Amino acid sequence: NLFQFARMINKKLGAFXFXNYI
C-alpha cells in the first residue's frame, strides 16, 4: 500500500515537473 502511495506521489511529481518543463 505504501509503495502504491509512493508511486502515485512520484507520478504527480513527474507530471508537475513535466508541466513546468513545457
UniProtKB/Swiss-Prot annotation:
Protein family membership: Belongs to the phospholipase A2 family. Group II subfamily.
Catalytic reaction(s) noted: a 1,2-diacyl-sn-glycero-3-phosphocholine + H2O = a 1-acyl-sn-glycero-3-phosphocholine + a fatty acid + H(+)
Purpose: Snake venom phospholipase A2 (PLA2) that inhibits neuromuscular transmission by blocking acetylcholine release from the nerve termini. PLA2 catalyzes the calcium-dependent hydrolysis of the 2-acyl groups in 3-sn-phosphoglycerides.
Cofactor note: Binds 1 Ca(2+) ion.
Signal peptide: none
Any one GO BP annotation for this protein: lipid catabolic process
Organism this protein belongs to: Daboia siamensis
Cofactor: Ca(2+)
Entry PTM: Seven disulfide bonds are present.
UniProt key word Transmembrane helix: no
One Gene Ontology molecular-function label: phospholipase A2 activity
Domain of life from the UniProt record: Eukaryota
UniProt EC number: 3.1.1.4
Protein name: Phospholipase A2
Compartments, record wording: Secreted
